[in-house]
Amino acid sequence: MERMGLNEIREEYLKFFESKAHLRLPSFSLVPKNDKSLLLINAGMAPLKPYFTGLQVPPNKRVTTCQKCVRTGDIENVGKTSRHGTFFEMMGNFSFGDYFKEEVIPWAWEFTTEVLKLPKNKLYVTIYEDDDEALDIWVNKTDVDPKRIFRLGKEDNFWEHGLGPCGPCSEIHFNRGAGEVKTSEEFVKASDEDKIVEFWNLVFTQFDKDEEGNYNKLANPNIDTGMGLERMATIMQNVDTIFEVDTIKAVLDKVCKLSGANYKEDRVKDISIRIITDHIRSITFMISDGILPSNEGRGYVLRRLLRRAARHGKTLGINNTFLHNLTDIVIENCYKNYPELEEKREYIKKIIKLEEERFDETIDAGMQILNDYIKEVKNNNYKVLSGDKAFKLYDTYGFPVELTEEILEEEGISIDKEGFNKEMKEQRERARSAREETNYMGAEDTILNKIDLNINTDFEGYDKLEVKSKVAVIIKDEEFKNEIEKGNEGVIVTYNTPFYAEMGGQIGDTGIIYNDNFKAEVIDCKKNISGKILHFVKILDGKVALEDQVILKVNEGRRNNIRKNHTATHILHAALIKVVGDHVQQSGSYVDDERLRFDFSHFEAVSEDELKEVEKIVNKEIMKANAVNTKVMNIEEAKQQGAIALFDNKYKDDVRVVSVGDFSKELCGGTHVSNSGQIGMFKVVSEAGVAAGIRRIEAVTAFKAMEYVDHKNNILKEAAQILKCNEKELLNKLNHQVLEMKEKEKEIEALKLKLASGAEDEILNNIKEIKGVKVASAAVKDIDGNALRDLGDKIRDNMQSGVVVLGSNYKGKVLFVAMATKDTVAKGVHCGKIIKEVASIAGGGGGGRPDMAQAGGKDPNKLEDAIKTVETVVESLVK
C-alpha cells in the first residue's frame, strides 16, 4: 500500500470508473435543485435523485462523481471528536438501470486491491444476511477470503428511507488494529470500537417498498455507491483522523500558526483548532455556491458555522478577523477539482470578512446584554439565569451556552439548563415543521412529473411566435386524458412549441392554441422536473384530442415587453458591476411584461448617486442600439470570453451566451430583443434590502418607464398647484412650509406644557391616602412621554413621600408612567408591578424598577378605566 494524497485518490477513483464507461460529472452545487426535502446536499446520490426515480433522463446510464457535501446534524460533536466534520466529499459510481451486482462488486474489489493496493489481509466485507446473490459474487468473482465475509442484519446492511426504492447493501471495511477477526460478533465489536472502519458502501437498489410493507422487485434495479474521500485518505496516509489528512492538515497548520497554539498539547485548544479547520472548509464551499449568511435556511447554517469558528478563534487568542485568510489554504488544495473556488476567491473572502466584522459587533452587544442579566440576577438575589435568556444570547447574539456558563460561573451564577434545552428543542421543532413536506426522493408527487420521458418538446420560440404541432399529452383533473373540451382547464403538451416556459427568472408566455375545431387560451407555460414544456390552458371553444394537429401562437405584444425587460436586466447587471463593484453577483431575478426585478449581492444600500449613475449607464447603452447576439458555445470557451454565469446553475457542456454589444455577456436561455434600442427607456423604481447581503432593484422599461415618469410629473404638478407655486419654486416652498410647521409644533408643545402645569395643581389637590401611603393618579390628555415624565417628577417632588401614576392619550396611543419615593418602596410599593396591572386594562404592557416604571397601551378608550385601578393595585402591594 503506497501513500496517496487526497486529491490523488479522488482522481484515481474517477479515472477508474471512466475506464468502465462511466460519465464523469462535476460535483453538483451544495444548494439542492428541485428538492425540497434537503437544506443542503448531504450525500453523493442526493443530486441524482431524479435519475433514480425516472423523473429525468440521465446524461449516461453510468455516472461517477465526487460530490461536495455538508452535514450539520451533529455539529456539537465537531471538534470534540477527531472524526466528526461538517464538510466532506463523497465519491460514487452509479448505474441507472444498467449494470448491477455482478459488475459493481468485482469493480469495487479491483479498485480497492489493484489501484489503491490495500492489503487483502486487512479487508473485510459485509453483506445483508439474506443476500445470497451478493455472497455468491464475492466468493466466485473476486479473490476475497470467504472467511472475511460477514452476514449482518437489516440495521447494518439494508438501505431504506421510508417508502420507495430500497435494497440490500454490501460494505468494504479496513482493519486498523483489531487483530484477526473470525466471527460477526467480533467484527461488530471491533467496528464499534473504531478498530475496523467501513470505507465503501455498495447499495443495490432492487426493491420498491409499498405502504403495506411489501418489497416489490424493481424492473430496472440501480446501483448507488459511496466512498468518503477523507476517510479513505486516512487509510491511505496511515493517519488516525481526518484532521491529519494532507489537504486538511494544511488548514490546521495555518490555524496553529495564526493562533500560536500547538496541536495536541492542550485538549481545550485542540477542540477550537479542529472546529475552525473543519468549519472554514464548509464556509468556503457554501459561499462559492451562492449561499450568504442570514437568519434562516441555508444562510443560517452558514452564519452559525462562521460565527462558531470566529468565536473559537477568540478562544485561541486571535482577536482580529482571520477566517477570510484561511480561505486561501482551502482553495489552494481544492481548486483543481473545484475551479469555481479560484474564480470566486476574492468574493468568498469578502463575504467572510464582512460577517466576521458583524460578529465582532454582535459579540460586544451580547456581552452588554449578559452583563445586564448578571446585574438583574444579583439585584434579585437569584443564583440562576433563566433558560430563555441564555437561549436569547445563544440564538440572537451567537453566544454558545458554554461561553455563557463560563462567564456566569465566575459570578457565582448557573444556567437553567432545562429551560435552555426546552427553548432549543422548540426552535428545532419549528425549523423541522417549517420545511415543506415532500417524499424522500425530493420531487413533488404530481401527475405533471409523470409524463413519459420519451415525449420531447422542441422549443422554437427564439425566432418564431407561431408553429404547427401535434398534441402529445392532455392532463385534466390530475389525470391523463385522451381529449379535453370547452369549459375545462388543463395542461397540453405538444411535440414542438414557440411558448417559452418559465425559467431563469423569466415568466412563461401566454397566447392561444387552436385549429378549425377548437380554441384554447394559454394562461401560463412552465416546465416539469424532467424539462417537459407544459401549456396550462383554458378551453374556450370546441375540443381537442391526442395527436390532433394544432397551431400554437404566442401573445406577441406581451412577449416583446418581456424581451425588453430581460435584456435590460442583463445591462443593469453589467452596470452594477461597473458602478458598485465586481463583487456584485446575481442572486435572483424576475422578468415579466410589466417590470423587472434584480437581486444581487451587496452589503449596504446603493446610494442615490450610484443609482443615478447606474440608470444613466443603462440608458446610454440602450441609446447606442447595440446588437444583441446569441451564440451557443462550450462552457469553458464562454467563461474565457468573460460571460457571467450564475452561482446556482448547473450548466451543460454547451451553453447559450447572450451579448449586448461589448457591454454585457451572460449565459442565458431566455428571450431578448435584437438590439438594445428596442428597450426604449429604463427607469429604476426602487432599491431595497431583501436579506442579509442581498439588495433588490425594481425597474421598468419602454412605455411603462414613460408612464412612471409621467406619474411622477403629475405628482409634482399637483403638489405645485396645492402650494400655489410653479414647479421650479416647489422645493423652496416645501422647505418653507416644513420650517413653519416645526415652529407651530413647538408652540403647540409649549401650550401643552402649560396645560400640564395647570393639571399639576389639580392632581396635587386630589391626592388619596391608602394604608399610610399618598397616591396621586390622573389621566392627562395630549402630552407625550417626555412631558408625562416631567409632570410625574414635579408631582413626586412636591409630595416628598408617595406614589404618582399618570396616563396620557397621545396621537392615538396610550402612555403610562409610575414613580415612587424610596420610603414607599420600603412599604411594598413596586412601580413595575403597578404599571403592569394598570397598562393591561388598556391592552398594553410594560414594567420597570420598584421606584420608576413606564408602559404603553393600545386602547385610548380604556385610559380612564386603567387609571381608576391604581388605588386598588397600590392597596394590594402596601404591607
Curated annotation (Swiss-Prot):
Question: What reactions does this protein catalyze?
Answer: tRNA(Ala) + L-alanine + ATP = L-alanyl-tRNA(Ala) + AMP + diphosphate
User: What is the predominant subcellular site recorded for this chain?
Assistant: cytoplasm
Superkingdom, according to UniProt? Answer: Bacteria
- Provide this UniProt record's keywords sorted from A to Z: Aminoacyl-tRNA synthetase, ATP-binding, Cytoplasm, Ligase, Metal-binding, Nucleotide-binding, Protein biosynthesis, RNA-binding, tRNA-binding, Zinc
> Is Transmembrane helix among this UniProt entry's keywords?
no
Does the record's keyword annotation contain Iron?
no
Q: Which cysteines are joined by disulfide bonds?
A: none
Entry binding sites for Zn(2+): 566, 570, 668, 672
- Membrane-crossing ranges are none
Q: What is its EC number?
A: 6.1.1.7
Q: Which region is the signal sequence?
A: none
Q: What class of enzyme is it?
A: ligase
Which GO cellular component term is one of those annotated?
cytosol
Query: What are the recorded GO MF terms, alphabetically?
Result: alanine-tRNA ligase activity; aminoacyl-tRNA deacylase activity; ATP binding; catalytic activity, acting on a protein; transferase activity; tRNA binding; zinc ion binding
**SMART domains the UniProt entry points to:** tRNA_SAD
Identify the InterPro entries for this entry.
Answer: aa-tRNA-synth_II/BPL/LPL, Ala-tRNA-lgiase_IIc, Ala-tRNA-ligase_IIc_anticod-bd, Ala-tRNA-synth_IIc_core, Ala-tRNA-synth_IIc_N, Ala-tRNA_ligase, Ala_tRNA_ligase_euk/bac, DHHA1_dom
Cofactor annotation: Zn(2+)
Protein family: Belongs to the class-II aminoacyl-tRNA synthetase family.
The UniProt function text for this chain reads: Catalyzes the attachment of alanine to tRNA(Ala) in a two-step reaction: alanine is first activated by ATP to form Ala-AMP and then transferred to the acceptor end of tRNA(Ala). Also edits incorrectly charged Ser-tRNA(Ala) and Gly-tRNA(Ala) via its editing domain.
Task: Quote the protein name from its UniProt record.
Answer: Alanine--tRNA ligase
